């Protein structure tokens, strides 16, 4: 068992609240550190001691399987004492404000808090009220930085680079924090980004984020190296954004016919959870061009890298 990685990278930030604000050097450093953890996680002994004696609280106000489990595994493999707080047991359901919750948790002296919340900006509010480091595990439609990092790692490992690639992000861009974080990261790293969706699922002024816009799959996937599908986030929809699920799949669901519009060696990604038969069919999701399972594996490595990089900034680290 070793206590540290070969990489000496230290993230120049106390928190990870978003991709926005990270430099190219920050992103590259996190991806390089993640590579070390990919190899560690494939060994029999997956333990490190770099977070021994540290307390990590996973604070999830929205249901999560992949992200919460991934952060829990990441923390435990680094030797942290990990506590998962369920929203059903939180005092916020009894009327306590988020600020009160933050101050209560801060009194327990956690070193790292990992938070997911349905409100954009909630994680930043928490970060202003606590002494430890805060990681954004998704806040509303704002950002999901570790998802963008694991997506970038997956792409880089399979394509050898990010610079110059064309990444088509397809589906419910309007409600997607994953799309926003990926757009920021991919643009920073020199990739071309094209968003593909019906007009009702595109944020107004999305072009200002430096993306190309297409409103049908033939145009959208033309020349794409990576096809990243997004699910319909019906829990965030207050009205009718698509006529029907079947019609949406007909025009925007990824099947073999539509995938053929992309480059022959194009690879398929999805942040999960997938709605099979809505934005993607099973043949493509489980096919040879799919990286979806690999994304899950990369998630643990990336979150280990983020936890260690932030822990190196903690007092007495």
UniProtKB/Swiss-Prot annotation:
InterPro entries the record matches: Asp/Orn_carbamoyltranf_P-bd, Asp/Orn_carbamoylTrfase, Asp/Orn_carbamoylTrfase_sf, Asp_carbamoyltransf, Asp_carbamoyltransf_Asp/Orn-bd
The protein's annotated pathway: Pyrimidine metabolism; UMP biosynthesis via de novo pathway; (S)-dihydroorotate from bicarbonate: step 2/3
Binding site for carbamoyl phosphate: 66-67, 116, 144, 147, 272-273
Gene Ontology MF terms: amino acid binding; aspartate carbamoyltransferase activity
Catalytic activity entry: carbamoyl phosphate + L-aspartate = N-carbamoyl-L-aspartate + phosphate + H(+)
Residues the entry annotates as binding L-aspartate: 94, 177, 231
Keywords, alphabetical: Pyrimidine biosynthesis, Transferase
UniProt EC number: 2.1.3.2
Example GO BP: amino acid metabolic process
Annotated signal sequence range: none
Gene Ontology cellular component annotations, sorted alphabetically: cytosol
UniProt family annotation: Belongs to the aspartate/ornithine carbamoyltransferase superfamily. ATCase family.
Function: Catalyzes the condensation of carbamoyl phosphate and aspartate to form carbamoyl aspartate and inorganic phosphate, the committed step in the de novo pyrimidine nucleotide biosynthesis pathway.
Record note on quaternary structure: Heterododecamer (2C3:3R2) of six catalytic PyrB chains organized as two trimers (C3), and six regulatory PyrI chains organized as three dimers (R2).
The protein, known as: Aspartate carbamoyltransferase catalytic subunit
Native organism: Nitrobacter hamburgensis (strain DSM 10229 / NCIMB 13809 / X14)
């Amino acid at each position: 068992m070793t206590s540290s990685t070969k990489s000496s990278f230290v993230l120049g930030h106390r928190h990870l609240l978003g991709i926005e604000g990270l430099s190219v050097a920050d992103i590259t450093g996190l991806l390089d550190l993640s590579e070390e953890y990919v190899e560690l996680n494939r060994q029999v002994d997956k333990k490190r001691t770099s977070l021994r004696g540290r307390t990590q609280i996973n604070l999830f106000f929205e249901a999560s399987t992949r992200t919460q489990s991934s952060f829990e595994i990441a923390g435990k493999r680094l030797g942290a004492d990990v506590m998962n707080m369920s929203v059903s047991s939180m005092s916020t359901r009894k009327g306590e404000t988020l600020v009160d919750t933050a101050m209560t948790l801060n009194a327990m002296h956690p070193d790292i808090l990992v938070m997911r919340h349905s409100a954009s900006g909630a994680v930043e509010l928490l970060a202003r009220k606590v002494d430890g480091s805060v990681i954004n595990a998704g806040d509303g439609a704002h950002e999901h930085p570790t998802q963008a990092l694991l997506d970038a790692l997956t792409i880089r490992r399979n394509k050898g680079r990010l610079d110059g690639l064309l990444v088509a992000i397809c589906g419910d861009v309007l409600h997607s924090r994953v799309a926003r974080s990926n757009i920021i990261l991919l643009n920073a790293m020199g990739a071309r980004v094209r968003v593909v969706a019906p007009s009702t699922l595109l944020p107004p002024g999305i072009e200002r984020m430096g993306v190309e816009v297409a409103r049908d799959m033939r145009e959208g996937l033309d020349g794409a190296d990576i096809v990243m599908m997004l699910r319909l986030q019906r829990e965030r929809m207050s009205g009718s954004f698509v006529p029907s699920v079947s019609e949406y799949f007909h025009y925007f669901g990824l099947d073999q016919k539509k995938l053929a519009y992309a480059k022959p060696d194009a690879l398929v990604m999805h942040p999960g959870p997938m709605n099979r038969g809505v934005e993607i069919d099973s043949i493509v999701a489980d096919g040879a061009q799919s990286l979806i399972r690999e994304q899950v594996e990369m998630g643990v490595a990336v979150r280990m890298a983020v936890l260690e990089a932030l822990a190196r900034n903690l007092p007495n680290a």
